């Protein structure tokens, strides 16, 4: 049966190496590894069975990054916690378990456990003791410590290399605020603690695209979407909006425009929350509040009333030519990313 959430992007991370660090109780045979490889077929994806003891795991990872020289490191849960400490690389920490010792205690991880995925050494089970829990508490105390020795310039550079992604339905770890106290690039995605195809495609892939664009110094044409085109009379996304938005972000830099209502701060917050709820991670930091659309530099403006002084091409949403988002999709498909 065809999976509607898996789509391949051979042009993204082409010829590059992606390193994946798995979560607690998992292995390099995790389905996430094959999911990444399937999505980015021209990239090389590497992963390693991480030792149970955290100091050994970090030693292995520090050895491996020198060996494989990854262009991007992605870590999930425990792997996200380790990934934060691999300074100097572009990396994504997904639901990072920065309070691993407490998480183990809260979720009854003490005692005999079963490896969730096949390990290269053939082990099927392992034992979590109080001593091991203490080891994880100690390793998490090292998180963020490397930032303290950096100069302001080095810190700013390092912070631009790291993304934290947090599932809004994660009931296992809750480290968004802790992460945000050290790194500015933190976003939510719709999903639970464990990634599935949908949360990976909608939450992680857009960030990988941004990172690849930055690495390649790739400038995509800019599309502005005015918020007057987004919602129906009930406040829900208009028909085919999600389809159009997901198509556009694959080829363009897409920004949401909303009026800068100085006397209505609550509306500013409501507009941002709507975008996060319905457009999710791709809209993160891609909302522009402005009352002067003619001052914006861009290629396309989709608006119910496009500003005649906008320097690019205006598409009048709701007109006979662009009555619905389906007509907008057809227009941009014909352009082919131009």
Regions found by a protein language model. Name each.
Residues 185-222, 313-338:
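Charged phosphate-binding loop/patch that engages nucleotide di/tri-phosphates or the phosphate backbone
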Residues 74-84:
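Gly/Ala-rich beta-loop-alpha elbow adjacent to hydrolase catalytic centers
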Residues 265-338:
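C-terminal cap/substrate-recognition subdomain and adjoining C-terminal extension
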Residues 90-211:
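The alpha/beta-hydrolase serine catalytic core
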Residues 5-67:
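Active-site catalytic motif of lipid deacylating hydrolases and related acyltransferases
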Residues 231-255:
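Short, acidic loop-to-helix structural element flanking the phosphoryl-transfer center
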Residues 71-75, 91-93, 162-168, 287-289, ...:
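Short, hydrophobic beta-strand segments that form beta-sheet elements in well-ordered domains
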Residues 216-235:
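Asp-based phosphoryl-transfer active-site loop
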């Amino acid at each position: 049966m065809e999976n509607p959430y898996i789509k391949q992007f051979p042009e993204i991370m082409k010829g590059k190496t992606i390193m994946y660090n798995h979560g607690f109780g998992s292995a390099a045979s995790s389905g996430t590894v094959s999911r990444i490889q399937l999505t980015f077929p021209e990239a090389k994806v590497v992963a390693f069975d991480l030792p149970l003891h955290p100091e050994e795991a970090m030693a292995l990872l520090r050895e491996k990054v020198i060996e494989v020289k990854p262009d991007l490191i992605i870590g999930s849960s425990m792997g996200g916690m380790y990934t934060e400490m691999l300074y100097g690389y572009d990396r994504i920490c997904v639901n990072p378990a920065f309070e691993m010792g407490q998480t183990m205690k809260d979720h009854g991880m003490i005692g005999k456990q079963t490896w969730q995925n096949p390990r290269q050494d053939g082990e099927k089970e392992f034992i979590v003791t109080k001593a091991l829990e203490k080891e994880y508490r100690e390793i998490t105390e090292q998180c963020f410590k490397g930032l303290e020795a950096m100069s302001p310039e080095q810190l700013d550079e390092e912070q631009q290399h790291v993304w934290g992604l947090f599932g809004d339905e994660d009931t296992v770890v809750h480290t968004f605020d802790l992460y945000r106290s050290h790194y500015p690039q933190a976003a939510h995605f719709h999903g639970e603690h464990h990634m599935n195809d949908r949360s990976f495609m909608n939450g992680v892939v857009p960030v990988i695209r941004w990172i690849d664009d930055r690495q390649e110094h790739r400038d995509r044409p800019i599309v502005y979407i005015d918020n007057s085109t987004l919602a129906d009379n009930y406040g829900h996304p208009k028909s085919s909006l999600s389809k159009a938005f997901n198509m556009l972000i694959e080829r363009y830099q897409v920004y949401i425009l909303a009026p800068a209502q100085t006397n209505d701060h609550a509306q500013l917050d409501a507009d941002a929350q709507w975008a996060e709820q319905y457009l999710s991670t791709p809209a993160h930091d891609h909302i522009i509040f402005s009352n002067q659309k003619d001052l914006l530099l861009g290629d396309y403006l989709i608006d119910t009333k496009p500003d005649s002084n906008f320097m690019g091409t205006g598409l009048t949403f709701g007109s006979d030519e662009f009555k619905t988002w389906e007509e907008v999709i057809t227009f941009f498909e014909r352009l082919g990313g131009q």
